[in-house]
Amino acid sequence: MNISYDDLGFFHRLGADGIRLDLGFDGRKEALLTFNPYHLAIELNMSNDVAYLENILTHQANTSFLYGCHNFYPQEGTALPYHFFQSSSERFKKNGIRTAAFITSQSGTIGPWDINDGLPTLEMHRHLSVETAAKHLFATNLIDDIIIGNAYASEEELKSLGHLDRYQTVFRIEFVANVNEVERQIVLEEQHVRRGDITDQVIRSTEVRKKYQKDENKVHDTEFEFVVGDVVVGNDRFGKYKNELQIVLEPHSDPRKNKVGHITPEELILLPFIHPWSKFKFIEK
């Protein structure tokens, strides 16, 4: 094709916005590419946890045109584990490089290879809904852009991504039959903030109890052990803690708390990303 890294005019004439370097060169060449006169973005492969990026940056790359994107993995069992994804992504984020990763449509059947078991970056996402996988990537604060790897995503999948709040986690909750109107309001209509002095047992949203301190909350759904992902609200037995909302992180029992619902099981992977002072909300499944 007679193409050289010294002249990217071929890609410009194609109408491309950028090029991906899956393997790369020696660092100096990549840095020079970021100064191409066509302002084409130069995208690096993020799925290698080595000092490749640092080498490019030592050659004074133009980081305004330098991007990072992970690979996708069509074969079941071959995508990245989370700890490796985290380490390799942090290399880019700490240097202010824009990042991207892939999620997989559960309805798409078309990919670039003859094997297509989905096209995620993370193996843990392979059988998750696009909504939950995207929530997880945004919750890590490591990924700026999300790409659906396979075609074609369903209208429902696209709509769910279109309504996604990328700036805070919104949990889907299934309510128990006995949930009352005050509890529904506390769960669905309030902005929740995890208390800053955290505990291992629960995620506490304490400000809501002040707003609802005068509202009655009769006892219900207290006679069993709460499990991880249960959402509980303090009942009339709980004194000053009445109507405080909590998400259960460790199994325990407490008759002063009503179970009002449970976070959708596949979204339990989001709980570790609710840090001190993190904001979060709920929607009904």
Question: Which residues fall in each region the model found?
Answer:
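C-terminal functional modules
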Residues: 176-285
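N-terminal start-of-chain detector that recognizes signal peptides
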Residues: 15, 39-41, 71-72, 116-120, ...
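Acidic-enriched, low-complexity/disordered segments with a strong bias for Aspartate over Glutamate
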Residues: 6-7, 17, 22, 26, ...
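Active-site beta->alpha loop and helix N-cap motifs at the rims of alpha/beta catalytic domains
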Residues: 1-65
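Generic detector of short, locally flexible boundary/turn motifs and exposed helical patches
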Residues: 7-10, 32-35, 64-68, 109-114, ...
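Short low-complexity stretches enriched in small and charged residues
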Residues: 24-27, 55-59, 100-104, 197-205
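Histidine (H) residue identity feature
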Residues: 12, 70, 83, 125-127, ...
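Catalytic alpha/beta core domains of metabolic enzymes, predominantly
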Residues: 45-177
